């Protein structure tokens, strides 16, 4: 994030597509034989959002690598797009799905999911989880609370 802030022509903002490309490049180094696909719409995102968003994506991809494909390797997809005044980020796989009866709000939920929910709260977003035997889908919807000052755009 710091590198992207330094390179950005908009103080305090990062280009989301570049940030996601770099994040996914680094994540691919720890995915073993899994295939990681990443895509993002081009948009500017405040550093206040980029840092927790990067941590959240890292945690969800790490969980997919650990648990989604117990029988071998598979695909994990990360996408980000702007919808109205919201950023929607999706992390999905086609693996085993979450354990039956899994409730992210229960105390027995993993530390990783507690980190995820902490980041969701920090981002003032909503997280929707869909899971079955064909995989899991985590959809984060967060408001875009700040934009760069239009008078400073080059």
Give the positions of each predicted feature.
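Conserved short strand/loop->alpha-helix "switch" segment adjacent to the catalytic nucleotide/phosphoryl-transfer site
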Residues: 28-75
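Glycine-rich/acidic phosphate-handling loop/turn and adjacent ATP-lid/helix
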Residues: 87-113
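Detector for a conserved hydrophobic position within an alpha-helical segment of the HATPase_c
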Residues: 120-121
């Amino acid at each position: 994030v710091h590198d992207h802030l330094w390179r950005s022509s908009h103080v305090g903002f990062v280009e989301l597509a570049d940030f996601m490309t770099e994040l996914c490049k680094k994540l691919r180094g720890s995915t073993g034989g899994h295939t990681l696909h990443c895509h993002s719409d081009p948009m500017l995102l405040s550093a206040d959002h980029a840092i927790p968003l990067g941590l959240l994506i890292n945690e969800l991809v790490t969980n997919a690598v650990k648990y989604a494909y117990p029988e071998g390797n598979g695909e994990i997809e990360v996408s980000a797009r702007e919808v109205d005044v919201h950023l929607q980020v999706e992390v999905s796989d086609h693996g085993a799905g979450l354990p039956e009866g899994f409730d992210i709000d229960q105390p027995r939920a993993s530390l990783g999911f507690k980190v995820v929910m902490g980041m969701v709260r920090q981002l003032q977003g909503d997280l929707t989880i869909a899971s079955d035997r064909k995989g899991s889908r985590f959809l984060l919807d967060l408001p875009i609370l700040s934009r760069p000052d239009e008078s400073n755009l080059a």
